[in-house]
């Protein structure tokens, strides 16, 4: 998924520069791909389709399972907090509504589609992915021909800030816990799993580089915003403000769907509930995994 990582990297790397960011995107992309392939192989070797904590319990024992489960929960909730917060900022910019109202508007399609599970998300992702690619091509092309563009900005670098950027790049790629769900979706064609992961990782890498490159090319470092598309739109004009931020909302939305479904499946697997499609199980878990990040975002406890 392209979500908080893609949209926050330009701001995070404003002191280090694009070359440092690209270097870490390539390194962490390769490392993450290796780990995802390892998880994919382990998943396919395990006859029962289980989530990452289930695999860890089988091969690493109970302690490993608990640690992996905690990591999945923390990372998933962190991403969802960023999506709720970022969507509020974007809709405030576009519609002039308070941030908390924007967050609640985002919540409707985010939680609504996620409720119906993998099939609904699959259809939504296909349609929105095409739209995202078209919008990204338009924005990037407009950036390259913009009068306020400055090529020197994308070549500036300060390796003193390289280490913190590693963390940003690694966070952008984290998706190993999505692999068991991919295996579940391709259980009838297991040979397609590894190529699908590799292609997906390549596409993510390209998108992760294009977004900050386009933003940094037309925006001075001191004017970069935490959500990249806000600065992108301000630099290109009103039309771009809407396109860029609709792109951002779609990116957050599709990532939210994947992460929320995976977190739900991990909880069901860890506590050995019989199915994540049972309403009596799905409803209370959904309320919890939506309610925690939503409450933290609206309360201002995190930002």
How would you name each of these model-derived features?
Residues 5-10, 80-88, 110-122, 145-151, ...:
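Transmembrane helix-loop junctions in multi-pass membrane proteins
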Residues 34-97, 241, 245-271:
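Hydrophobic transmembrane alpha-helices that form the core helical bundles
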